[in-house]
Amino acid sequence: MARVTVQDAVEKIGNRFDLVLVAARRARQLQTGGKDPLVPEENDKYTVIALREIEDGLINNQILDVRDRQEQQEQEAAEIQAVTAIAEGRR
């Protein structure tokens, strides 16, 4: 298991409070959202993986926001297609 120093991750994010929010958000995505890690798992817990991704500059708040918006737009487009297909089937 790789040792993660929080100081390296803090430098990437800006302050430790935002680091906690970003790391928790990413760890939650990894655990429940079916997201794939951007670094090798190496038998680490999701929080450690999230911190390693932040240290490597692969994840920050802006990146998470962009990804969330993209996924939301894709989901909304799929829902609109489904509703349209249902509506056309009733005609």
From Swiss-Prot:
Catalytic activity: RNA(n) + a ribonucleoside 5'-triphosphate = RNA(n+1) + diphosphate
Major enzyme class: transferase
GO MF annotations, alphabetized: DNA binding; DNA-directed RNA polymerase activity
SMART domains referenced in this protein's UniProt entry, alphabetically: RNA_pol_Rpb6
Assigned keywords, A-Z: DNA-directed RNA polymerase, Nucleotidyltransferase, Transcription, Transferase
One CC-aspect GO term: DNA-directed RNA polymerase complex
GO biological process, one term: DNA-templated transcription
InterPro entries in the cross-refs: DNA-dir_RNA_pol_omega, Pol_omega/Rpo6/RPB6, RPB6/omega-like_sf
Keyword Nucleotidyltransferase: yes
Oligomer and partners: The RNAP catalytic core consists of 2 alpha, 1 beta, 1 beta' and 1 omega subunit. When a sigma factor is associated with the core the holoenzyme is formed, which can initiate transcription.
Function: Promotes RNA polymerase assembly. Latches the N- and C-terminal regions of the beta' subunit thereby facilitating its interaction with the beta and alpha subunits.
Protein family according to the UniProt entry: Belongs to the RNA polymerase subunit omega family.
Protein name (record): DNA-directed RNA polymerase subunit omega
